[in-house]
């Protein structure tokens, strides 16, 4: 997998994300509370319980021992004021989970799981759309950096991310129009196959 390309290539298809080829990394947006309880996150939890356990542990560790990152000031679309914010991790980061043996044996394919932490909460506590988009920018940049590090440090015998596949993340329960998240992927210069459900 080449990272990042000069020009992005986002290919949208209808189908089942979980039918992605062996070695693909499946990208989805996550909350920071350790819950994959509804929507496509629930499907991820059901298909990849070992990956879910890693995600949940990652969130619980950061909830019990909070760490923060200070985000530089950005100009908001609504005003000309520049505001900065402190962000509690893992918000605005990515977690790349290698294929887990138990999940791969059950599903017949080795899939990497990439969690983009785009909303602090879920349900009524979901972050506002502008915050989710900003967190998506940060998380995609973090994912791209981590993938480049993985690629640079890999021996020929090690499993590697072969392709990036994604759902239309943030567009479901987080309520952000897909076009806004797609723009983030395009701006990152990534090659991603985006799968939407049949008729979706």
Swiss-Prot record:
EC number(s) given by UniProt: 3.1.3.84
Family to which this protein belongs: Belongs to the POA1 family.
Coiled coil segments of this chain: none
Protein name, entry field: ADP-ribose 1''-phosphate phosphatase
Catalytically driven reaction(s): ADP-alpha-D-ribose 1''-phosphate + H2O = ADP-D-ribose + phosphate
InterPro entries (UniProt xref): ADP-ribose_metab_enzymes, Macro_dom, Macro_dom-like
Domain annotation Macro: ranges: 1-200
Protein's organism: Neosartorya fischeri (strain ATCC 1020 / DSM 3700 / CBS 544.65 / FGSC A1164 / JCM 1740 / NRRL 181 / WB 181)
Entry keywords, A to Z: Hydrolase, Protein phosphatase
Record-linked SUPFAM superfamilies: Macro domain-like
Residue positions binding substrate: 15-17, 29-31, 36-41, 169-175
GO biological process, alphabetically ordered: peptidyl-glutamate ADP-deribosylation
GO molecular function, one term: phosphoprotein phosphatase activity
EC supergroup of this enzyme: hydrolase
Superkingdom, natural source: Eukaryota
Functional note: Highly specific phosphatase involved in the metabolism of ADP-ribose 1''-phosphate (Appr1p) which is produced as a consequence of tRNA splicing.
């Amino acid at each position: 997998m080449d990272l990042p390309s000069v020009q992005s290539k986002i290919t949208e298809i209808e189908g089942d994300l979980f039918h992605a080829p062996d070695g693909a990394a499946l990208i989805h947006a996550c909350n920071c509370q350790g819950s994959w309880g509804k929507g496509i996150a629930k499907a991820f939890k059901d298909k990849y319980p070992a990956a879910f356990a890693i995600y949940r542990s990652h969130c619980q560790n950061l909830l019990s021992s909070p760490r923060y990152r200070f985000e530089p000031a950005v100009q908001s679309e609504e005003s000309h004021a520049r505001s900065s914010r402190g962000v509690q991790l893992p918000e605005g980061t990515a977690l790349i989970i290698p294929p887990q043996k138990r999940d791969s044996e059950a599903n017949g394919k080795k899939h990497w799981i990439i969690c983009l932490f785009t909303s602090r909460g879920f349900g009524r506590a979901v972050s506002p759309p502008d915050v989710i988009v900003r967190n998506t920018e940060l998380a995609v940049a973090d994912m791209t950096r981590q993938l480049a590090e993985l690629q640079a440090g890999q021996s020929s015998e090690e499993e590697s991310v072969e392709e990036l596949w994604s759902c239309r993340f943030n567009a479901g329960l987080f309520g952000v129009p897909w076009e806004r998240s797609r723009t983030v992927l395009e701006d990152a210069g990534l090659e991603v196959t985006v799968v939407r459900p049949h008729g979706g």
